[in-house]
Amino acid sequence: MFRPRHWVLAAEAPEIVIDVQACLLTFFRMGRFHRLYPCAVGRPSTPSPRGQWHVVFKVEHPEWAVLGTRWMELDVPWGRYGIHGTNAPWSIGHWISNGCIRMYNQDVEELYDLVPLGTPVRIVGRYPGEPVAA
């Protein structure tokens, strides 16, 4: 499981780290742990894209209602993935999305205001039963 205290970041850079196994999003600010949020991530059959990405586009009140009240798009080259709110709050804490990161609307609204464009987003962790990389 991801443990925020083990990460060392550049002093001024904000960063988001998402642990798919734990369904947790950690926000670092000024190089220090700032806030931990529960989230929903992709199903094992439609996984969230593990790797290092960046927030490249943000919108308040996206037209597509299932995205909740905020959308923060990531620069994943093979699809459209982002961090967003939800119209299904019961889904938070589960592997249930098509790969995006879902948050409670009040949490994504708070995070949205803290995250500038270009913020690094690291998606880490394994799904249960997934083989460990050599």
Q: What residue ranges belong to the model's regions?
A:
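A structural motif detector for short, solvent-exposed N-terminal "entry" segments of globular domains
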Residues: 2-44
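Exported/periplasmic cell-wall-interacting domains
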Residues: 4-13, 43-50, 59-134
